[in-house]
């Protein structure tokens, strides 16, 4: 009844309504739940009922506004996978799907055409992979990464990247950069523990699933690094780290992309 409601409002033939309801429920993995009351369903199942109700209308435009935002972690992962299958196989060819999310992982996994918005302004448009690999500005780099990309205020001198008391050989894709001052971008996964590395202080340690996030500080430089295992750290612990500098991004002082590990360009 819930899924069929928009079709009944249009006074569509009962047989056609039943066919479309069955197909919509099948698309969202709810075959066999046709006669359940909505209060008998879990939160995730109720979310899928809402999606089926949207699909059954065969609308030309389907808008999903953060459909996973209020669900627990396991259910989000499950539905994200189901959405992937649905969007690749279960939508009519003429249907345009607009999926709103603040989670970069959803953007990458659904892998469609992406519009990056900030306060109503379009910052970048393109395939998800292109935006992830080549964010055109600092703001896009922050929005399209979780945790946000680390940004390090740096100076370039004698083919070295310099910040705080640290000097690192510039990567090959920085060779043609003329700017003396840069904002160097590094993802949290491109910072590594290294006993022979540079000393930073732990400001915060978070356990997220099977991953550890360390918030680090050295002088005025603050970084977030991700470790793909659960590790115990305390605030003010000293850790030594190194950088996958070949994965670094270069942004100009005004925040425009100069060079990425995937593609170089002049501002």
Feature map (PLM): residue ranges:
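C-terminal boundary and immediately downstream tail of ABC-type ATPase nucleotide-binding domains
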Residues: 133-158
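Generic structural "secondary-structure junction" signal
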Residues: 77, 151-153, 193
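ABC ATPase nucleotide-binding domains
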Residues: 1-136
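Non-catalytic connector elements of ABC transporters
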Residues: 149, 160-267
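Glycine-centered loop/turn positions within well-structured domains
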Residues: 105, 129, 138, 150, ...
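Residues located in well-ordered beta-strands
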Residues: 127, 139, 155, 201-203
